[in-house]
Amino acid sequence: MRKMKRWAALLCAVLMAVTLLPTQVWATDGTDGGSAAALEEPIVNDKPTMSEETATDGQPADDQTPAPTDDETPDAEVPEESESADPQEPEQEVDNQDTDNTDDSDVLCRATLDPISHELEVEQFSAEEAADAEITSAELNNALTSNKSGSSYFDIISVTRYGRAKLAKMSRSTVYLKIYDRLLEMAENFTVDKVSLPTNQKITHDEAWLVTAAFYSDYPELFWARPSFWYNKNTMLCSEIQLNYNSHIYNLNTELPLFLETAETILAGMPTGSDYEKELYLHDALIKKVTYTYSKLEEQNGYTTLVEGKGVCAGYAFALQYLLMRAGIQSYYVVGYAGENHAWNLAKIDGEWYYVDATWDDPVYNGSDDPYSPYHSYFNITTAMLQEDHTPSDIPYNVPLENCTATDAFYYKVNDTIVSTTDSGLVEKVADLLQRNGGIAHLYVTDSNPVMAAREWYYENIVSIARAMQVGGGYEYGYSYSGREIVLWFAGEFLSKTPGELNGSSGLDILDVELLYQYLTTGS
């Protein structure tokens, strides 16, 4: 504040000496311009910025229905007995009031994972109807026959599949892995029919949910099918598994090569180096390619996001997962709740696990991509950081997830731009970032209310920042944000001196007066 007063006092002194010179009007952000005016009443800036009222903490999620969570800890294992891990799946109840008098023991249900709600799409069939529920259209069978590619497609990725590795550590791992591997075999062979489970592999409804969810979350490249399972409504035991094909299957001869080609084009530009460098490139390349849109809401797979450049959270997460795994980086597709149902990733970077949310690093501004994207506020964060605004779902929605505690690969730690508005030297740091990055400074703000704190600090210190940058002429400034990441932008003419005080010192002296007089008389 003392610098601001000296600067204003200095200008007044010069203006009294040079009364005929034009007065410089300093433009400010229209959100709260009055508090930031340095010399005269500010003009209102028309550059679009994310105000506190209009900015969004990342993308809107995909469904208004909260995803339920259960009471098990993230490391809890599925019990061997039929105790439900799903709080919405009640104890076995037989409704004897059915008007059609159908015995529930004869009712079979097919449950398929829904990528939008993260719940199960459940269809009920009588025993006779279930026999006729196979996908047997000639068109589909022809498509499947012409698209058989064997295991080579899925062998392109050689890193460990996270979901399978977690199933392998559970008490009933032998049964779970046999069913998981059978699903993979069905995907490799484009199996259409239901596949019955041997008697010694019968599992409960929730166990089947867990295994199919683990498989689904392990294979982002399987964009033409979702796993499903059949269970008896009365016993709640799973007896059969099946793949539920979508419309991509009919065009797979064209779409599969295009999917691979698009991924390989992106991967071709990836730098050689550490996992962090590869991940950062892939994260940013994906965000620059994709537009968040509900037009592909029903698709929710990696193809539409990667190839067509359109998607919502599931598409972002599947596409990033696939690119990371192609780059040799272990990754997993995680579902949960973040204001609405949401999906993001786990990634193992240079030996440590982190969370990364590409969707929320690509926020929407006024219905369009934010001009300062890609952001990195959710790039390699810890579990504690994630839980500020994300809640991962428990079993059976996810397998047990990592407790991420490492911070070495957190973007803002790597770039030394984690700040508090109470930090000393912050004016000089921000001025330096703005000058080195074309008038844009990305910061991770640790204050309890990062947006409010950063905005107030910026408006209070803008004159000092401009002076440190040796600005010539008027300027505009504002901010944008996603989560704790605050983007400060500054539009103006920077003088050629090294960022700092006008004459390189912190004191007010004759050199300051001479420089200011030169600017007011010559504009340079």
Question: Where would I find each of the regions flagged by the language model?
Answer:
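Secondary-structure boundary elements
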Residues: 251-305
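Sec-exported extracytoplasmic/periplasmic mature domains
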Residues: 220, 268, 284-292, 325, ...
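Alpha-helical segments with a strong preference for the paired helices of cellulosomal dockerin domains
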Residues: 499-524
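Hydrophobic/aromatic-rich core segments of domains that either
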Residues: 315-385
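N-terminal accessory/pre-domain segments preceding catalytic cores
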Residues: 28-62, 70, 79, 83-273, ...
